[in-house]
């Protein structure tokens, strides 16, 4: 009722303002006069324009809030709250003139109390808006919502104290209490506010959790989660984080001397638990602080004299002598030498000798004589050495002088002929190579054939003189042109396709078509990947694709390989366009070398160019051949550095916040979220010898056979589309066809080889040229994954050309493992039509590049609604974390938590997973299970369209 009376009053007031008494009087006095045809009119007044609109407000405790609005030109302004007009008495109105326009500005203000808000029933919040009138009409302002502010006392989840080792990641969870407006969260470390911009070791996630990337000793502290809004401020219980250090042993000291100088004893060495010392309750070092071991010191043996020898004959000096040796035993192990003299002499004439000689028993006389002889010999040796040195020096001087005079008259004809360059290691081809003379003999496809042959020039007659001048020795090299051929192994196999010009023009004959291989092509390609100039990048249409993308994103796909690159919307900065490429590296040299039980599980894929600025991760999809259900794998993603060596990017299930990517592992493919483009490969390692790789076996035979020999080639390949496609391309060049559909084989990490054998051959018409009962492919050749097109060849010979039917069995199995049997029946006179073409055009899209919205299944508008609804965490938990769980992408949620829009990254990954046959139904089902019915309606509507 009050609202109606207020409306009536407003209408009456408007009529009074429009009524002019002078017009009424004139009509009364001269009612009989004719009215003029027209009246002078004032300029039309515009619609009211709001200078100030009411803003959202919160009622704190019992204090009412004020809502105000200003508009011009306006004759009246009234508030309408929840669809009903506010009483005129509740309005406070002020009027003024706008200095710039001279128009009348009206300002109205009302108060909304807590009681008014609480009296409202229904799901909608209390709202008010202004309605302004002018002679031109009315204008409505925005709705301002008035809510009662509050903040609950109890946190939904409080942080818990932890003890963590040094350098480990720490996660402290906090869910603030419910409140209006939503509480802001900050973390305190010992009562100091944590600012991640100042200390990058801290990270605050979108759901208010605190992550310490690498725990330091200084991070040992008390942590408190604080939630606050305009009403109150709440503190959680304090969580104490203790960063401890486990003790580590120092290096062992040197062994002490043996305790016993002679015989058996013991010695010890020590170490201390100081590397590092245990801190903050860390564990003490395990093991002994000292080691003790037995030792044996060989006892010293003192020397002893032997018996004296017999006396010698009497000499001219009238003396005879005798000797002894210190050999009974000799001194050993540091024992003392014998004391006494070696020689003993005495007069042998009983004093009748008249000569006065020194007795031989005088040791000093013998020593003097010996020293004199030594000096004499030394002097002679020195003199001879000096004379020889002088003679040699004179000879060298004379020789050099003669050579200098002789060289001025000599012309080196060989140097003139070759221009100062000498050929090194010229080798001619061997024409006796059976692979070249007999194309029917099956080649060994496991050996690569990247052979370079340069032009051969005939040497000139040595009698011809070429004068030496100051001109360059060699003319400038002509520009280089590289012709690229697909793989071929027989001498008659022509090249299939020419590559793009990479460097220029090369003289004809540099690369013969019968020996050109993909290996050289890929070496040249990988050498140029660092450049962002894509015009000179050689491209193989079957293994590479490129496209230009902007901020709307898109998708690159290599048909028939399962390799693709998804560029999400917003990954490329606004206003920029990148030409991006995706290629599969075919050369074996582009794969990492396997170490131990490690194996390559995917092709080596390059996406580029490197160094691009990306605003959000792109998704690279690669097929793999691991049997993930075995659950005995250690999976790793590796990237190739600029120096060519491979580096580990991430080990699955060992991610940290510093991990630069995320891997979503599916049964047959892995989807990798990348911030940096480059060359990547997926590898695995078995840690208990029970991991299993998926292989596929394919049997090929010649499409036409005009000789008595007939070859069956059995390939053992990784179970990926890329591996089969490469072999199909190879066999097309060899003129082979696929005898039977490829069969799968589970190959176990057991060190057992793969054994192939031929059975049930009709010996009346055929015979096998294989001498052994079976062939084997070594285990490591298969398990490493770095060798391509592994195969064995069974060469058969028919007794006559009239034999055109061949039936046999080929058994392929791993020793003590699984196997497959091929039952072959073929007719040599017939060529199965399209057997290779059918597989080469296997299922899968042939579209290589999709741009903008055409590359995505979720429309941008629906995607934005889903992100807005799920990005913000809530107490019920039906946010982006539950979406990741429903879509089986919750292996490491912290990766998504660090992104500005976790939901957006999850939806990007979902787009990559649904490339081939996905629709919106799976996403709609996940949203329905989460209780997001409003999102479900939008998704279902778009899905029906």
Curated annotation (Swiss-Prot):
Domain TSP type-1: 246-300, 302-354
Keyword rRNA processing attributed: no
Signal peptide feature range: 1-26
Name recorded for this polypeptide: Netrin receptor UNC5B
Tissue: Highly expressed in brain. Also expressed at lower level in developing lung, cartilage, kidney and hematopoietic and immune tissues.
Ig-like domain segment(s): 48-145
Keywords on record: Angiogenesis, Apoptosis, Cell membrane, Developmental protein, Disulfide bond, Glycoprotein, Immunoglobulin domain, Lipoprotein, Membrane, Palmitate, Phosphoprotein, Receptor, Repeat, Signal, Transmembrane, Transmembrane helix
Site entry: Cleavage: 412-413
Residue span, Ig-like C2-type domain: 147-242
SMART domains reported in the protein's UniProt record: DEATH (SM00005), IG (SM00409), IGc2 (SM00408), TSP1 (SM00209), ZU5 (SM00218)
Entry similarity comment: Belongs to the unc-5 family.
Keyword Iron: no
Listed GO MF terms: netrin receptor activity
Membrane topology (UniProt): Single-pass type I membrane protein
Stretch list, region UPA domain: 689-838
Modified residues (Phosphotyrosine): 581
Protein localization: Cell membrane; Membrane raft
Extracellular side: 27-377
GO cellular component term, pick one: membrane raft
Lipidation, S-palmitoyl cysteine type: 403
Annotated glycosylation sites: 222, 347
Assembly and oligomerization: Interacts with the cytoplasmic part of DCC. Interacts with GNAI2 via its cytoplasmic part. Interacts (via death domain) with DAPK1 (via death domain). Interacts (via extracellular domain) with FLRT3 (via extracellular domain); the interaction is direct. Interacts (via extracellular domain) with FLRT2 and FLRT3 (via extracellular domain), but has higher affinity for FLRT3. Identified in a complex with FLRT3 and ADGRL3; does not interact with ADGRL3 by itself.
Cytoplasmic side: 399-945
Organism: Homo sapiens
Effect on the protein upon substituting residue 412 to N: Abolishes cleavage by caspase-3 and subsequent induction of apoptosis
Domain named ZU5: residues: 543-686
């Amino acid at each position: 009722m009050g609202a109606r009376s207020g409306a009536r009053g407003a209408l009456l007031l408007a009529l009074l303002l429009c009524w002019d008494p002078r017009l009424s009087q004139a009509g009364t006095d001269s009612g009989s006069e004719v009215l003029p045809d027209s009246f002078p009119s004032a300029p039309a007044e515009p619609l009211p324009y709001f200078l100030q609109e009411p803003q959202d407000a919160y009622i704190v405790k019992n204090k009412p809030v004020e809502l105000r609005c200003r508009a011009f030109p306006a004759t009246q302004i009234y508030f309408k709250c929840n669809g009903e007009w506010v009483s005129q008495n509740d309005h406070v109105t002020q009027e003024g003139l706008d200095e710039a326009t001279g128009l009348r500005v009206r300002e109205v203000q009302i108060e909304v109390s807590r009681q008014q808000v609480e009296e409202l029933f229904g799901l909608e919040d209390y709202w008010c808006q202004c309605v302004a009138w002018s002679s031109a009409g009315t204008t409505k302002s925005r709705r301002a919502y008035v809510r009662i502010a509050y903040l609950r006392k109890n946190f939904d989840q409080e942080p818990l104290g932890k003890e963590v080792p040094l350098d480990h990641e720490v996660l402290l969870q906090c869910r603030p209490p419910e409140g209006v407006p939503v509480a802001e969260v900050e973390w305190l470390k010992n009562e100091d506010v944590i600012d991640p911009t100042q200390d990058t070791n801290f990270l605050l996630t979108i759901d208010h959790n605190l992550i310490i990337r690498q725990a330091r000793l200084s991070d040992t502290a008390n942590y408190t989660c604080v939630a606050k809004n305009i009403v109150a401020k709440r503190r959680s219980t304090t969580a104490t984080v203790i960063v401890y250090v486990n003790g580590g042993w120092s290096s062992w000291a040197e062994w002490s001397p043996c305790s016993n100088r002679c015989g058996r004893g013991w010695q010890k060495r020590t170490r201390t638990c100081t590397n590092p010392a245990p801190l903050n309750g860390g564990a003490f070092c395990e093991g002994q602080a000292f080691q003790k071991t037995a030792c044996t010191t060989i006892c010293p043996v003192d020397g002893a004299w032997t018996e004296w020898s017999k006396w010698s004959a009497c000499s001219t000096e009238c003396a005879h002598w005798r000797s002894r040796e210190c050999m009974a035993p000799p001194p050993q192990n540091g024992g003392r030498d014998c004391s006494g003299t070696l020689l003993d002499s005495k007069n042998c004439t009983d004093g009748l000798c008249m000569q006065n000689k020194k007795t031989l028993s005088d040791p000093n006389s013998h020593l003097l004589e010996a020293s004199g002889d030594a000096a004499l010999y030394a002097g002679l040796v020195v003199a001879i050495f000096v004379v020889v040195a002088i003679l040699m020096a004179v000879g060298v001087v004379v020789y050099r002088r003669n050579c200098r005079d002789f060289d001025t008259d000599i012309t080196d004809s060989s140097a003139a002929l070759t221009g100062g360059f000498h050929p090194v290691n010229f080798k001619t081809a061997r024409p006796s190579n059976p692979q070249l003379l007999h194309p029917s003999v099956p080649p060994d496809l496991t050996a690569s054939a990247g052979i370079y042959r340069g032009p051969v020039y005939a040497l000139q007659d040595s009698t011809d003189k070429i004068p030496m001048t100051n001109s360059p020795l060699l003319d400038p090299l002509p520009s280089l042109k590289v012709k690229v051929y697909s793989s071929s192994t027989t001498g008659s196999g022509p090249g299939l396709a020419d590559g793009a010009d990479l460097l220029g023009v090369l003289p004809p004959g540099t690369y013969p078509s019968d020996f050109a291989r993909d290996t050289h092509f890929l070496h040249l390609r990988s050498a140029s990947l660092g450049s962002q100039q894509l015009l000179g990048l050689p491209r193989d249409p079957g293994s590479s694709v490129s496209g230009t993308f902007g901020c709307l994103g898109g998708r690159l796909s290599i048909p028939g390989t399962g390799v693709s690159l998804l560029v999400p919307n917003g990954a490329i900065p606004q206003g920029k366009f990148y030409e991006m490429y995706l290629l599969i590296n075919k050369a074996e040299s582009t794969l990492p070398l396997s170490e131990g039980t490690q194996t390559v599980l995917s092709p080596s894929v390059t996406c580029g160019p490197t160094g691009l600025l990306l605003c959000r991760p792109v998704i690279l999809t690669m097929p793999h051949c691991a049997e993930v259900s075995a659950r005995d794998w250690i999976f790793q993603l590796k990237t190739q550095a600029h120096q060519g060596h491979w580096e580990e990017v991430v080990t699955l299930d060992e991610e940290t916040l510093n991990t630069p990517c995320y891997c979503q592992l599916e049964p047959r493919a892995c989807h990798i979220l990348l911030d940096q483009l480059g060359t990547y490969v997926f590898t695995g390692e078995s840690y208990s010898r029970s991991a299993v790789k998926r292989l596929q076996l394919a049997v090929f035979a010649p499409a036409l056979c005009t000789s008595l020999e007939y070859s069956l080639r059995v390939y053992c390949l990784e179970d990926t589309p890329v591996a089969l496609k490469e072999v199909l391309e190879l066999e097309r060049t060899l003129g082979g066809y696929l005898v039977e559909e490829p069969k799968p084989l589970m190959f176990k990490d057991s060190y057992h080889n793969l054994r192939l054998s031929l059975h049930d051959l009709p010996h009346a018409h055929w015979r096998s040229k294989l001498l052994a009962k079976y062939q084997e492919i070594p285990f490591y050749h298969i398990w490493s994954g770095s060798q391509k097109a592994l195969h064995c060849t069974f060469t058969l010979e028919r007794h006559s050309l009239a034999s055109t039917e061949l039936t046999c069995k080929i058994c392929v199995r791993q020793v003590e493992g699984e196997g497959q049997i091929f039952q072959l029946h073929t007719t040599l006179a017939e060529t199965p039509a399209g057997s290779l073409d059918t597989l080469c055009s296997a299922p899968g899209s042939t579209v290589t590049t999709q741009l903008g919205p055409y590359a995505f299944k979720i429309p941008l508008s629906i995607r934005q609604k889903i992100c807005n609804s799920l990005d913000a965490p809530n107490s019920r938990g039906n946010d982006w974390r539950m979406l990741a769980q429903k879509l089986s992408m919750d292996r490491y949620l912290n990766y998504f938590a660090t992104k500005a829009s976790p939901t957006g990254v999850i939806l990007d990954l979902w787009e990559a997973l649904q490339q081939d046959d996905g629709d919106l139904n799976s996403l709609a089902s996940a949203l329905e299970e989460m209780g997001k019915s409003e999102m479900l309606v939008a998704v279902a509507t778009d899905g029906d369209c």
